[in-house]
Amino acid sequence: MPDRLAVLAQYALPKRALTTWAGKWASARLGGLTTALIRRFVARYDVNMAEAANPDMAGYASFNDFFTRALQPGARPLARADLICPVDGAISQFGRIGKDRIFQAKGHAYSTTALLGGDAAMAARFDDGHFATLYLSPRDYHRVHMPCAGELTRMVHVPGELFSVNPATACVVPGLFARNERVVCVFESAPGPGGPFALVLIGAAIVGSMATVWHGQVNPPRPGTLRQWDYAKGQVRLQQGQEMGRFLLGSTVVLLLPRGPLQFNPQWAPARPIMLGQAMAQRCAD
């Protein structure tokens, strides 16, 4: 009950104003104060700085630099698998996509069309496909990498709410991931014929911005209207394991995969911790 009340209280909070303030504060260069706050954050969330490319907490000019810290080379070896985990975090849910329906939590599902910003034709390409919802906590590495090689075809910034995306909120707020602000990145598998796949970066309260490697910072600005960018064939190609984007602080990634035989890692289960590069799934022969 306390968790539910805390989640319901989010409806009354000025989430957008708080997030704007947090974004400005996180980008500020405050010298020793920034270092002191980073040290406090690392202690509170038990962040493993030993694996960071720069383990010196005094070496980050702003909180944003710390949140988006790189890892040391070799810190996340890539498994030999058709699909690898694109992030560090925990499994929220995974499984089959129904006809325009994705499972969120017990008693809750949401529309694929709504998740993708209202594009029913694109959503239909994922009917009877597969999804994985992956939660990044504040302590996790905040960059997002490619689960397989792909060629970018479209990016959409969808305006929306800024609820928290932690597991407690996912169990209470209907259609959470299709309500929050998000950046939809649609790819074609390269080389084919794997079909389309989408990485959807879900915004959240206090997540100041999201960025991609080909565009840079996507938000802010937050104009309140849907924005779409289309990409020519061959314009943006990324290899498996290559960075594609990043969050400031932490949030959720929803991965959509097309119809076809697929076997998720048998060790996968909701709430299980995952790490970038681990085996996620194998495509199966028809």
Curated annotation (Swiss-Prot):
Major enzyme class: lyase
Function comment: Catalyzes the formation of phosphatidylethanolamine (PtdEtn) from phosphatidylserine (PtdSer).
Subunit structure: Heterodimer of a large membrane-associated beta subunit and a small pyruvoyl-containing alpha subunit.
Location within or outside the cell: Cell membrane
Residues marked Cleavage (non-hydrolytic) (site): G250, S251
Involved pathway(s): Phospholipid metabolism; phosphatidylethanolamine biosynthesis; phosphatidylethanolamine from CDP-diacylglycerol: step 2/2
Catalytic residues of the enzyme: D88 (charge relay system), H145 (charge relay system), S251 (charge relay system), S251 (schiff-base intermediate with substrate)
Sites bearing Pyruvic acid (Ser), chain numbering: S251
GO cellular component: plasma membrane
Entry note: cofactor: Binds 1 pyruvoyl group covalently per subunit.
Keyword Lipid metabolism applies: yes
Chain's gene name: psd
UniProt entry tagged with the keyword Lipid metabolism: yes
Membrane-topology descriptor: Peripheral membrane protein
GO molecular function: phosphatidylserine decarboxylase activity
Pfam families, per database record: PS_Dcarbxylase
Name listed for the protein in its UniProt record: Phosphatidylserine decarboxylase proenzyme
Cofactor(s) this protein requires: pyruvate
